[in-house]
Amino acid sequence: MLYHPNDIPDEAVEALRPAYERSSKLYGTPELWIQRCREGTAQLWRSEDGKYWAVTEVYEGTAYGKLLHGLASSGEFCEELVQEGEAWAKEQGCKAAMTGGRRGWEKLFSTMGYKTVAVMLLKEF
């Protein structure tokens, strides 16, 4: 389910914290993600059973026009929630969806029609 910006529960920050802890930490914090959802610049999703949470954002001006970006997710993966997000994105005029993450996501998302298009590299100073 997609939350309206005014209805985002406080528990969302802690529900998304595991995603942050396992992430590259390049895309902000759970607090920032939820702030953006409350401002309407990102979207918060939760599976019907409450075990899977995700944050998305819509990019404009890409090679695809509008594109849905899966920013973060946490909990027990729910393919139905991903499909719900994709359907919503199509309604918004998005022509594609993308996400990033750890290597295991490649196999999982490839079964849903996603393909690997880039590898991210990081060097700390």
Segments predicted by a language model, with ranges:
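Active-site rim helix/loop that mediates acceptor-substrate recognition in acyltransferases
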Residues: 23-42
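Terminal substrate-recognition subdomain of acyl/acetyltransferases
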Residues: 4-7, 59-60, 100-125
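Short glycine/proline-enriched coil/turn segments at helix->beta-strand junctions
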Residues: 47-51, 93-94, 115-117
